Amino acid sequence: LFNIVTPDRAYFGQKDAQQLAVIRRMVRDLNFGIQIVGCPIIREEDGLAKSSRNTYLSDEERQAALCLSRAVFAGQKMVQDGERDAKVVLDAMKAIIEAEPMAKIDYVKMVDFENIVQVEKIESEPVLCAMAVYIGKTRLIDNFIFDPSCNCSGSEAEGHCCCGHCSE
């Protein structure tokens, strides 16, 4: 499709961050002259990542599902505050999710954002912290991307870098 349409830019949501990483890699490997722009996750007022799957949740499950965003925000804060041990961050996130009786973790992982290879330490490359959790029979995903080399101010500008807060 990129060969047929030949766009200057293509926009992909960060919510499916693995797809975003694969598309970026493909564009780079195949030397397409396309800027792939990651669009930030859109969240409901209570923090839950917007998804068509949210409609499958009962009111009780919907409340239980908030453990995902609580875990994401807690992990993100730990990393922003300087924690670089992936296991420490992941264990804290898992504890938040496991405290919710209706939640069943499929996975919670931290990987190198470019290669999708699991990491033990956050060093100089962007990392993706992604999760999939069942709430009842509904599988929900959420994530955050952290780029240690990003010095953004936290203001959202067009383009969005890996951290989701500044231009690429």
Segments and roles (model prediction):
Residues 1-104, 113-115, 144:
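Nucleotidyltransferase catalytic core that binds NTPs
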Residues 92-168:
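Phosphate/ribose-recognition catalytic cores of enzymes acting on nucleotide-derived substrates
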